[in-house]
Amino acid sequence: MQCDRLWHNARLATLAESRPGLGLVEDGVIAARDGRILHAGPTAEAPSFAARETIDCEGRWITPGLIDCHTHLVFGGDRAQEFEARLAGASYEEIARAGGGIVSTVRATRAASEDDLVAGALRRLDALIAEGVTTVEVKSGYGLSLAAERASLRAARRLGAERDVTVTTTFLGAHALPPEESDRDRFIDRICAEMLPAIAQEGLADAVDAFCEGIAFSPVETARVFEAARDAGLPVKLHADQLSNLGGAALAARFGALSADHLEYTDEAGAAAMAQAGTVAVLLPGAFYFIRETKVPPVDLFRRHGTRIALATDCNPGTSPLTSLLLVLNMGATLFRLTVEECLAGVTREAARALGRLHDLGTLEAGKWCDLAIWDIERPAELVYRMGFNPLHARIRRGR
């Protein structure tokens, strides 16, 4: 059988659900043609391949390329001054209510050119790519006007043209009330009637998100945005239950959301509803750490009900200025007590599920895109165990 590239003498963590645990294969081979995997499994079970190029992995471990399924990479400015205010005792909510927080980034983002937004985002993206990330989700939400949201989403799309990485984009118009607007209902009307339909028609977004929280939007307002997204044919996801329990997890489940994210205050009913709906719990330990939260997401409830768990950086200027998915692995284990298997699945298979891309990403299986990360490690647990450590040997996207 013909193939373009063949990686042999490798150990595989396939993350395939057809295999137990991490889907480990001690003597493995991966064959790819036209960017997709033809075979990923034991050498003894592989067909005879005639490869244009053969790569000896010398016993290294191969995982699926890593997926960062929740980021805000496109923004202007920074929020270092707010960091100092928090160190002096101000809370995230106090800063937001005083006109800082998201709104301060909105001002900086609107003032930046699209080229400047791309340049800043590329620096952050490059840090993720250097650790084996092959797919990244990028949200808007720092424009909060049709023109500025368009510019942010165009900038996000350009990242995929500038770098060898798959970029999925999410319209987060319902992130905060913009500084020029005082009427929440009127702003939600504008999102639903003007912004979201235009962005959907222009193909700038793959999904729609909202921030359902006391300092942002209510469940009723969020539901209006989700109904408009459904009318536009776009899937939804939700920033939910981060600072309080407004029933965001259950709301996300009611709309069949791809994911609900943060979830520190989610209750058992929310966890059960998410499991029933197939909504992935995306946990964001970087934000938990950075704003010094104390309430841990209910991981035991997610396990009990079979809710899938993913991990992501939540890279953003205010609450998680983090561009290391490897550090997120360690944080997920140490802060949230996730297992090694849950952590590694959370940045591969379950992250793909959270983006609605499990059919072609997230595991090493025939038919999926050949996105690989090759590591200089003795065992996969090292990726979770060590900090400040990047053992990436090679990163392959679409077989190249």
From Swiss-Prot:
Alphabetical list of InterPro entries matching this protein: Amidohydro-rel (IPR006680), HutI (IPR005920), Metal-dep_hydrolase_composite (IPR011059), Metal_Hydrolase (IPR032466)
GO cellular component, one term: cytoplasm
Biological pathway: Amino-acid degradation; L-histidine degradation into L-glutamate; N-formimidoyl-L-glutamate from L-histidine: step 3/3
Subcellular location: Cytoplasm
Catalytic function, reaction form: 4-imidazolone-5-propanoate + H2O = N-formimidoyl-L-glutamate
SUPFAM superfamilies the UniProt entry points to: Composite domain of metallo-dependent hydrolases (SSF51338), Metallo-dependent hydrolases (SSF51556)
Cofactor: Zn(2+); Fe(3+)
Binding site for N-formimidoyl-L-glutamate: 142, 316, 318
Sample GO molecular function, one term: iron ion binding
Function: Catalyzes the hydrolytic cleavage of the carbon-nitrogen bond in imidazolone-5-propanoate to yield N-formimidoyl-L-glutamate. It is the third step in the universal histidine degradation pathway.
The protein's name: Imidazolonepropionase
